[in-house]
Design a protein with these regions (language model features):
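N-terminal secretory signal peptides that target proteins for export/translocation
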Residues: 1-20
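C-terminal segment of classical bacterial N-terminal signal peptides
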Residues: 31-40, 217
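Cleavable N-terminal signal peptides
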Residues: 27-28, 38, 389
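Helix-loop-beta hinge of the Bergerat
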Residues: 353
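Polar-ligand-bearing catalytic/cofactor-coordination segments
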Residues: 41-106, 110-350, 360-460
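N-terminal acidic, proline/glycine-rich, low-complexity intrinsically disordered segments
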Residues: 2-4, 37-43
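Bacterial N-terminal signal peptides
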Residues: 22-34
Length: 460
């Protein structure tokens, strides 16, 4: 979400990482933890492997056979879609970097600062008067790429169901939330910059962590319903098994919600979100339409894993560490840039909002360069949730079939280097292999049919 607009509506089971390094990237780390609430329980121990469990074939051969069931044309289409995102990652970075440089070199940023100072003498209102036109300029200049990436291209690959006007309406809602959330954040950050010009990086980290906590708390209740309707799932044959898994893992909710995501996308998704009384289990209507009960159980157990394994708190901690390092490096680079170009750009100091494009450029560049490492952190938590999910649901074939469905828009069999750099979730191949390893080790012949080995698809 895509990366990724400010308040992403993507669920964690299929989230994408497309980074747009502007001031919005200072907010973007919230996306990783919005759907992973802060609460922890022990991970249930996997059942003991049955001695001598028969298998028709080994896990490696079964994995290869499952991958071979995907027709070549569908595989090529999926690969082309996902590999195109590698380039979009670069184009988004280059575009927003160019915008930041343009705002500095043209002194538009300095003129916005001058306008804000003429409009009011109140410091916090000056930041607001600067931030609103700044966000408007950035949104306008990035709109063509946003339109291609999130509307035209999604329709090109058959992943979107929304016509332009409803899509544009949601973009406007997202922009309004960016204005509100981004302005509040900038007011707080610039108050820190003024009061602690040398140690601002440490205090700014604390501000960002508090902001992220706020987003995690309010998103399920106040933000996500702006884009989708959540209704109680009225199918007990589906909700009862999900709630049984939730009760077994002490997840404090008594209801499952259905999300009307099919009016926007063909993707399947689900999440367990919220904390402090806002916890909610939700799955989208595409998942209900396209998946069997074993597949749904596999997905929901994975999402419960994020909750039970306390991934929200862990990722918030990792985010705090990354922010502290990023802000510390940004301070050094910002001061160096100021000594060389500050007068030319009309930027006075870190406390001057005219320096916001420089701050965004430096921090966004660091974020862009750190993409492989940030993706790895998230990918590790996703693999932990996969392990929890398969132990909880005991649905290895369901996990495999969902991985293949996600393969409609995620490359199933990337190279190790691709997976390290670009994947914030385990690849389909990795998930299928985990499921087959688990099935071979944990399901005795009396509990499950012999290791299912699909026949390769004979189409092209």
């Amino acid at each position: 979400m895509t990366s990724s607009a400010f308040f992403s509506r993507r669920f964690r089971y299929q989230a994408d990482a497309v980074i747009k390094p502007s001031i919005i990237t200072l907010l973007g780390v919230a996306f990783v933890i919005v759907a992973m609430p802060v609460c922890a329980e022990e991970n249930p121990a996997p059942p003991a492997a049955a001695a001598g469990s028969p298998s028709a074939v080994g896990p490696a051969a079964a994995t290869k056979a499952w991958l071979a069931t995907v027709p070549r044309d569908k595989r090529e289409k999926s690969d082309a879609y996902f590999e195109g995102r590698y380039w979009l990652l670069l184009w988004n970075f280059l575009l927003t970097a160019a915008i930041c440089i343009f705002l500095l070199e043209s002194r538009i940023s300095a003129r916005l600062r001058d306008f804000a100072e003429r409009a009011t003498k109140v410091r916090s209102l000056q930041i607001a008067c600067y931030a609103i036109p700044y966000f408007l300029i950035v949104a306008t200049l990035t709109f063509p790429l946003n339109l291609y990436e999130n509307f035209l291209r999604e329709h090109q690959y058959g992943l979107a169901t929304q016509s332009f006007l409803p899509w544009f309406r949601e973009q406007l809602i997202g922009f309004g939330l960016t204005i509100i959330g981004g302005t509040i954040l900038l007011i707080a950050l610039y108050a820190v910059f003024r009061k602690a010009p040398r140690t601002w990086w440490a205090w700014a980290t604390a501000v960002m962590v508090i902001f992220l906590l706020g987003v995690v708390f309010i998103a399920p209740v106040f933000i996500e319903p702006l884009f989708n309707t959540y209704t109680p799932l009225m199918k007990p044959e589906i909700s009862d098994p999900i709630l049984a898994m939730a009760r077994a893992n002490q997840i404090p909710t008594g209801q499952v919600f259905e999300v009307d995501a099919s009016r926007q996308t063909t993707r399947v998704s689900a999440n367990v979100a919220g904390f402090l009384g806002t916890t909610r289990i939700a799955l989208n209507d595409n998942l209900l339409k396209e998946c069997t009960l074993p597949e749904i159980r596999a997905v929901m157990a994975h999402e419960m894993g994020h909750y039970v394994l306390n991934h929200g708190a862990k990722l918030l901690t990792y985010s705090g560490i990354f922010l502290a390092i990023g802000f510390a490096l940004t301070r050094i680079l910002f001061d160096a840039a100021m000594r060389r170009w500050g007068v030319r750009w009309g930027v006075r100091s870190i406390a001057d909002p005219a320096g916001l494009p420089l701050l965004a450029l430096i921090f966004g560049t660091l974020l862009f360069l750190a993409t492989p490492f940030l993706n790895t952190i998230v990918r590790v938590t996703e693999r932990e949730a996969d392990a929890f999910g398969i132990n909880t649901s005991r649905e290895p074939d369901g996990m495999v079939k969902v991985a293949l469905k996600l393969g409609a828009y995620r490359k199933l069999d990337p190279t190790p280097l691709e997976e390290f750099i670009f994947f914030d979730h385990p690849s389909g191949r990795a998930r299928i292999r985990m499921a087959m390893d688990w099935k071979a080790a944990n399901l005795p012949a009396g509990e499950s049919s012999p290791l299912e080995t699909p026949l390769p698809h004979d189409g092209h």
